[in-house]
């Protein structure tokens, strides 16, 4: 804890450091990701990572260049993440219907998605270019 509602976390294996701030609507500076922002971002990152693993294992169209737009909606009483909306945007590619189904299934089975409380609404949209 660095004070002023800011934290620092270091990944020991890579020595990479991240910082968090409490959001402005909760007495923080909001200059960095909040802890709940990291949860929402972790969900999107996990989904795309699992799709990348599936692409490698199955030898199907790669997902390199895939991006995600993430929106987190907070609920009150108790304060918590109520909804995470993710739009996963795939780069141009010749994805078959079968590959699309495989990737969509992979996204929903990522460990972060399976670890979040069932009351947290996960809204996922897939955009195939």
Segments and roles (model prediction):
Residues 1-41, 52-129:
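Extended beta-strand/beta-hairpin segments
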């Amino acid at each position: 804890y660095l004070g002023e509602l800011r934290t620092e976390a270091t990944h020991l294996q890579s020595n990479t450091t991240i910082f968090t701030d409490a959001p402005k609507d909760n007495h923080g500076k909001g200059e960095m990701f909040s802890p709940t922002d990291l949860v929402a971002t972790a969900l999107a990152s996990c989904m795309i990572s699992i799709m990348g693993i599936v692409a490698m294992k199955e030898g199907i169209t790669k997902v390199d260049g895939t991006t995600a737009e993430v929106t987190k909606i907070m609920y009150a009483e108790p304060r918590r993440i109520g909804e995470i909306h993710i739009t996963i945007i795939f780069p141009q590619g010749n994805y078959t219907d079968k590959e699309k189904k495989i990737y969509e299934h992979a996204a929903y089975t990522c460990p972060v998605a399976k670890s979040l409380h069932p009351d947290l609404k996960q809204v996922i949209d897939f955009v195939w270019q």
